[in-house]
């Protein structure tokens, strides 16, 4: 055994051992409980960042802990490999996306191995391989046949220069992020997954997920957005619009129908298109509305604009004519693309009506405010429920009674009814991009849209493609899109759109169960491993990825592929990794962000940074505060450099000790140094045990006989007490306090009296074997080496988790706090099994009690078992 701790040598040896013995390769075993532990797989961007390292370290700690508890543990890894960054890199570096992606996978896989994660690499998947996306295409065709995938026109952000669709986040101030062109809203044919078919089930099943954070469940509940309300039909005819029909509107405030003074429609609504035909000014306004993003989030901050169409609809109750406006705050993709405007009781409608001088009619008087009229400025009471006024026969009805009465009258007229609506929209999965899974559909002039037959799957994405950033490369490749119709055999055109990359990540966790299956998407092994017992990832995935995964699992269930409905039993959302930021002001108000590694700081007595300067020139820099590690703020720490300097175990230990997993982790160089010092102390004690203490182990063991000297029995009791707490904390995912317990155990071992060498060696052997196993999930490399070097037997990967022994925790004598009139005055030692009367007698006879009672008789003596005695005089 080396005298000094050398992380590089220790970690290389451990990793080679794990690889040569296939230590983490698992198969199904019906005789053991299974534990499927999964961290969200990474996008192969090039290098791991510290957020990745924290995520995968937390998962690895859980996986290794459960393995030692006897579980059959699966911890796989793969690559979420399709996506736009690869296309951007292809343009910047003139390298095909496939080549860039596979090179990144190779590098990042090496980084993960260097960190010592207990991953079953035999199950590795990359979503950009035909072996993977073939089954995604296969499922697409099944869902299409079941009606869960359909095609319709969808509104997208269109960059007219780059000739491509932009995601909402790529639209900056109404312009394309790369071209700078004004973005247009366009309607194009797109494929949709009918997630709304599962809306009720997805919502109701949230109550059956006790292992999920309440915050995540609330976010999903709000995203699904179940609303009970009234569908209202506003009729129109030849005299009002030029044709007959009804304008449908959904409202959750049916009680306010009598206060509707206008209706507003989206720019893409058929009535808007009809009105614009002979109105150049309106047509120009509609074009303006079609520029910019289509995100719902934009609506809250954007300036509300509108224009009258000259069209009118009929109020279904009063028969009054209401003007139809085009408004930029109405989305075609939400509801019916139209709203009934009640300015007196909706803040957005109020602002719009005030701006354009439209009528404001109060029809609800809040029970909390006795106002007579609705007038500027807006107050929240205007939107509250209350008693109807100015509403004819509905006057004096309260909210629910009013909704019921109005809905009944609408139904009787055939102009509306109660219904439930969801905020959740069907999932548009078509992307006009290259680096994604090809949609397995063919367009035939005679047969329409035809799925690609199974025997022709996969539709392989060509990998040797030149990316220019303009238009879809696939749409410019006749060799890709020219094909025959699978039904009639006539010339047809292959779909050139690819799928949203969220599709790949919506089922990868199920493919891990049988990644080598060439005959099925998943096979019977999936029903052994699914669902995932513990899923770990950032809360930023609370809605899209996690909701899509829940939908996909149900869709696969209904196709007979899996037996489960929920993909993830327990969810842990780890906190962000943050670090200090520093910058200098440049000309024009720009900031030059400086990496913390290049900055020297001064701290006050509490450790707070009070001044900072750039190491290279000694000149001051501005302290920007603590923020999430990011490239933009240049405050990231390179995991590779950290591992090279300190070793993977130090990095893992710091990450686990610095904060509970669900809390924010603030980076600290001194904390890393502290973790390194602790591991050196652990190594030094292990070296002392292996080279010195072990030789003193007696043949007849005092531990078994219960004949330890009192001082060593106290040390042993302390070790088992800390172990008991650590086991409790592990179950609560409070890994930072597990490390605290390990540190306390090491302190106890280091201070243990050595005058009885044989007894000391026994306590050291038991205590150190507990410590090494306690650290094994967190710092597996040093634990592997010390377990072998100290002769504890076998491989620590196969070792059982330590459990506290009642015999070790048992005390013959305990010490109780002694209080007189509630004030701490000393302590008293009593037998562990002493009765109340004996404790009272010993307390009253103690020197401290005699001193502070001052000769006065006790009124009463209060004994709190195991804690204290309080003498009241």
UniProtKB/Swiss-Prot annotation:
Taxonomic lineage: Bacteria, Pseudomonadati, Pseudomonadota, Betaproteobacteria, Rhodocyclales
Entries under InterPro entries matching the protein: aa-tRNA-synth_I_CS, aa-tRNA-synth_Ia, Leu-tRNA-ligase, Leu_tRNA-synth_edit, M/V/L/I-tRNA-synth_anticd-bd, Methionyl/Leucyl_tRNA_Synth, Rossmann-like_a/b/a_fold, tRNAsynth_Ia_anticodon-bd
Enzyme class: ligase
E.C. number: 6.1.1.4
Primary subcellular site in the record, as a coarse category: cytoplasm
GO cellular component, one term: cytosol
Name this polypeptide is given: Leucine--tRNA ligase
Keyword Cytoplasm part of the UniProt annotation: yes
Keywords for the protein's UniProt record, in alphabetical order: Aminoacyl-tRNA synthetase, ATP-binding, Cytoplasm, Ligase, Nucleotide-binding, Protein biosynthesis
Chemical reaction(s) catalysed: tRNA(Leu) + L-leucine + ATP = L-leucyl-tRNA(Leu) + AMP + diphosphate
Disulfide bridges in this chain: none
Subcellular location field: Cytoplasm
Chain span(s) of sequence motif 'HIGH' region: 42-52
Residue positions binding ATP: 631
């Amino acid at each position: 055994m080396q005298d000094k701790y050398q992380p590089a040598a220790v970690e290389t040896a451990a990793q080679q051992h794990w690889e040569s013995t296939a230590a983490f390769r698992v198969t199904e075993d019906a005789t053991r409980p299974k534990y499927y532990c999964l961290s969200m797989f990474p996008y192969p961007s090039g290098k791991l960042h510290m957020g990745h390292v924290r995520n995968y370290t937390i998962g690895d700690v859980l996986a290794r802990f459960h393995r030692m508890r006897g579980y059959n543990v699966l911890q796989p890894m793969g690559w979420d490999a399709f996506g736009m960054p690869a296309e951007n890199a292809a343009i910047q570096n003139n390298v095909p996306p496939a080549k860039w992606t596979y090179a990144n996978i190779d590098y990042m896989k090496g980084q993960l191995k260097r960190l010592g994660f207990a991953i079953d690499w035999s199950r590795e998947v990359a979503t950009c391989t035909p072996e993977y996306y073939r089954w995604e295409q296969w499922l697409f065709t099944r869902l299409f046949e079941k009606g869960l995938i359909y095609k319709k026109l969808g509104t997208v952000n269109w960059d007219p220069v780059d000739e491509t669709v932009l995601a909402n986040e790529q639209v900056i101030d109404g312009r394309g992020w790369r071209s700078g062109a004004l973005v247009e809203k366009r309607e194009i044919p797109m494929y949709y997954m009918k997630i709304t078919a599962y809306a009720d089930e997805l919502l109701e099943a949230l109550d059956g997920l006790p292992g999920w954070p309440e915050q995540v469940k609330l976010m999903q509940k709000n995203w699904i957005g179940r609303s009970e309300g009234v569908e209202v039909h506003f009729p129109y005819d030849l005299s009002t619009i030029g044709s007959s029909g009804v304008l449908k509107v959904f409202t959750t405030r049916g009680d306010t129908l009598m206060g509707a003074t206008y209706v507003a429609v989206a720019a893409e609504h058929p009535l808007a298109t009809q009105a614009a035909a002979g109105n150049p000014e309106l047509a120009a306004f509609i074009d303006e509305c079609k520029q910019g993003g289509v995100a719902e989030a934009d609506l809250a901050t954007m300036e509300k604009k509108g224009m009258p169409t000259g069209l009118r609809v009929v109020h279904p109750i009063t028969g009054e004519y209401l003007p139809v406006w085009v408004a930029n705050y109405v989305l075609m993709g939400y509801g019916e693309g139209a709203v009934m405007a009640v300015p007196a009781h909706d803040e957005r409608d109020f602002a719009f009506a005030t701006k354009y001088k439209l009528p404001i009619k109060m029809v609800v008087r809040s029970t909390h405010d006795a106002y007579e009229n609705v007038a500027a400025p807006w107050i929240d009471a205007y939107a509250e429920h209350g008693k109807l006024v100015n509403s004819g026969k509905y006057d004096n009805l309260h909210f629910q009674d009013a909704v019921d009465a109005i809905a009944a009258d609408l139904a009787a007229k055939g102009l509306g009814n109660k219904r439930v609506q969801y905020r959740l929209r069907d999932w548009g999965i078509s992307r006009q991009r290259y680096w994604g899974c090809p949609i397995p559909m063919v367009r035939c002039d005679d047969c329409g849209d035809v799925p690609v037959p199974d025997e022709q799957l996969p539709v392989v994405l060509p990998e040797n493609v030149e990316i220019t950033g303009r238009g879809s490369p696939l749409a410019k490749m006749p060799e890709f899109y020219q094909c025959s119709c699978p039904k009639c055999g006539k010339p047809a055109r292959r779909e050139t759109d690819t799928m949203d990359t969220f599709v790949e990540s919506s089922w990868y966790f199920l493919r891990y169960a049988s990644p080598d299956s060439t005959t099925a998407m998943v096979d019977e092994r999936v029903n052994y491993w699914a669902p995932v017992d513990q899923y770990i990832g950032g809360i930023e995935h609370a809605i899209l990825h996690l909701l899509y995964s829940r939908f996909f699992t149900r869709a696969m269930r209904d196709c007979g592929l899996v037996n489960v409905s929920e993909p993830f039993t327990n969810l842990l959302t780890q906190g962000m990794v943050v670090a200090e930021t520093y910058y200098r002001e440049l000309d024009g108000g720009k900031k030059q962000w400086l990496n913390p590694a290049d900055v020297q700081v001064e701290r006050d007595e509490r450790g707070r940074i009070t001044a900072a300067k750039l190491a290279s020139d000694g000149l001051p820099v501005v302290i920007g505060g603590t923020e999430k590690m990011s490239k933009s703020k240049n405050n990231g720490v390179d995991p590779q450099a950290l591992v090279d300097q300190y070793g993977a175990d130090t990095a893992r230990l710091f990450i686990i000790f610095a904060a509970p997993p669900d809390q924010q982790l603030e980076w600290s160089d001194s904390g890393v140094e502290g973790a390194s010092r602790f591991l050196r102390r652990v190594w030094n004690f292990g070296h002392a045990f292996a080279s010195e203490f072990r030789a003193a182990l007696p043949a007849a063991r005092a531990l078994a006989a219960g004949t330890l000297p009192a001082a060593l029995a106290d040390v042993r009791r302390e070790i088992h007490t800390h172990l008991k707490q650590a086991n409790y904390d592990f179950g609560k995912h409070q890994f930072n306090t597990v490390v605290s317990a390990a540190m306390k155990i090491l302190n106890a071992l280091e201070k243990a009296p050595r005058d009885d060498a044989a007894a000391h060696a026994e306590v050291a052997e038991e205590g150190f074997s507990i410590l090494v196993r306690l650290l094994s999930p967190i710092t597996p490399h040093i634990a592997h080496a010390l377990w072998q070097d100290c002769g504890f037997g076998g491989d620590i990967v196969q070792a059982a988790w330590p459990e506290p022994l009642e015999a070790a925790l048992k005390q013959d004598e305990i010490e109780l706090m002694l209080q007189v009139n509630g004030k701490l005055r000393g302590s008293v030692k009593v037998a562990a099994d002493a009765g109340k009367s004996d404790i009272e007698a010993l307390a009253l006879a103690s020197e401290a009690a005699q001193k502070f009672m001052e000769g006065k008789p006790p009124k009463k003596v209060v004994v709190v078992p195991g804690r204290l005695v309080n003498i009241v005089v």
